[in-house]
Amino acid sequence: MELNHEYGIMNTTPNIHAMIVAAGRGSRFGASIPKQYTLLQGQTLLQHSVARLAESAYIYQCLLVVAADDSTAQTLSFALPIYYAVGGAERWQSVQAGVEAMINAGADEADLVVIHDAARPAVPTHDIDAVIQAAMLEPYGAILATPVADTLKQSYIAANILSMPVHEAVLPHQHTQPELTINESDRDALHAYAQKTIDRSHMWQAQTPQVFRLGPLQQVLNYVAEHNLAITDEASAFEHLELPIRLVMGSRQNIKLTYPDDSILLTAILMAQFSSIVEIL
């Protein structure tokens, strides 16, 4: 797939558009409501995330991509003027719907779109500005990311070795995985085992915001749809086509609320950030 480069790196003063994807259900979080409406310090995650974007001098309004049956977003007050689009079943489909809405509203293909997760309310303002400034100098875009600090293990799933007959047990030196027929009643007996350690020297953890040229983003998402690709973020779509996306060093404060115990850490981070602002004032 070839993309038109005429609106690429030469346009270093593009218009900036912002989008927050808030159409997901957050099944891993385990709450009865979508996690973007979880309250932290008296506001929803979504309100916090919009407020962070509002602190950037580059952003003056925000598109919220919500589920078709969402009845909450429009009852909330936000720090930016808001307009809406209806998302899809997958994250990339929600982003695609947002891109189409922006283009239909008159956005140019050379413009930049800042895509942020509703569940990342603690992103520092200077990181938002840094990734936007980096994307201005790139033909396709840039994303926030942090180098992986922990040791990474690749795993395999097997029955507990101690509970298996000796001739069925899979030991580390065998480098194979047992053929298991998994019944619902057997799931509690399955465990993850370390298979190998992954070299982390070139590994980064992707964050948001992710910032892309609008035209190329539309094209790569169309490619994803046509080829039924499985992607976990928008940068993945560019990677499939071997198109360069710049990595911009982010902050480890910019965590995503994914599991219930993440809320404890996020609350502490938000309180510390607020205290720092008060001290400056």
UniProtKB/Swiss-Prot annotation:
EC number: 2.7.7.60
Keywords: Isoprene biosynthesis, Nucleotidyltransferase, Transferase
Residue(s) at site: Transition state stabilizer: R28, K35
Keyword Transferase: yes
Molecular function GO labels: 2-C-methyl-D-erythritol 4-phosphate cytidylyltransferase activity
UniProt organism field: Psychrobacter arcticus (strain DSM 17307 / VKM B-2377 / 273-4)
Catalysed reactions, semicolon-separated: 2-C-methyl-D-erythritol 4-phosphate + CTP + H(+) = 4-CDP-2-C-methyl-D-erythritol + diphosphate
Listed pathway(s): Isoprenoid biosynthesis; isopentenyl diphosphate biosynthesis via DXP pathway; isopentenyl diphosphate from 1-deoxy-D-xylulose 5-phosphate: step 2/6
HAMAP family (UniProt xref): IspD
Gene Ontology terms describing biological process: isopentenyl diphosphate biosynthetic process, methylerythritol 4-phosphate pathway
Site, as annotated: Positions MEP for the nucleophilic attack: R200, K256
Alphabetical list of Pfam families matching this protein: IspD
Species classification: Bacteria, Pseudomonadati, Pseudomonadota, Gammaproteobacteria, Moraxellales
Family from the record: Belongs to the IspD/TarI cytidylyltransferase family. IspD subfamily.
Gene3D superfamilies for this protein: Spore Coat Polysaccharide Biosynthesis Protein SpsA, Chain A
InterPro entries: IspD (IPR001228), IspD/TarI (IPR034683), IspD/TarI_cytidylyltransf_bact (IPR050088), ISPD_synthase_CS (IPR018294), Nucleotide-diphossugar_trans (IPR029044)
Function, in words: Catalyzes the formation of 4-diphosphocytidyl-2-C-methyl-D-erythritol from CTP and 2-C-methyl-D-erythritol 4-phosphate (MEP).
Name listed for the protein in its UniProt record: 2-C-methyl-D-erythritol 4-phosphate cytidylyltransferase
Cysteines joined through disulfide linkages: none
